[in-house]
Amino acid sequence: MIVVEADTDIFRVFNLVQHIFDRYEAWEERLWHILRHGANLPQMLEVSRDILSNPMHLIGSDFRYLAVTDEAYFQKDLGIRLDTETFDAEKMATFLSLHDLSTHVHEPLLLELQGARTLSVNVFDQEEYLGCLTVFEAFRPLRDSDRALAVFLVKLLRQAIQQNPVLASTRSA
């Protein structure tokens, strides 16, 4: 809902709303283009970076990194080593002591992870767990709209993984 509280040029309001619409439409078009031309997961996350405005990573069902944005944030701020194929065993043990893996949950999850809030959306092919997209609250607070945006992105990531199941077993970032 858009509320205009003062006398405003209706054409200016229209142009602002149109600009917002154009931004999301261009994002969707870029995602579909990537999906049709190789389904590159790191590219899909990278073009989504401007929309979600926070670091993200995508892991496969075997917990290997498939794609990551803002690697410096993960390495410097969270101490996560991305040069390995999978999570650090000690950090994973700490996480598991505090949280259930939740690989069965279809709804977006807000979690506290290493002192940062995260929004995670699992990727499913019907009931089969394919992986998880996690958006880290680092550069701006998470918004309610991020849930819908992440769910939309996950639907396209699922299609990319389905196009090439090898993507789910090796990190391609």
Regions found by a protein language model. Name each.
Residues 1-173:
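Hydrophobic, helix-rich cores of sensory/ligand-binding and other regulatory modules
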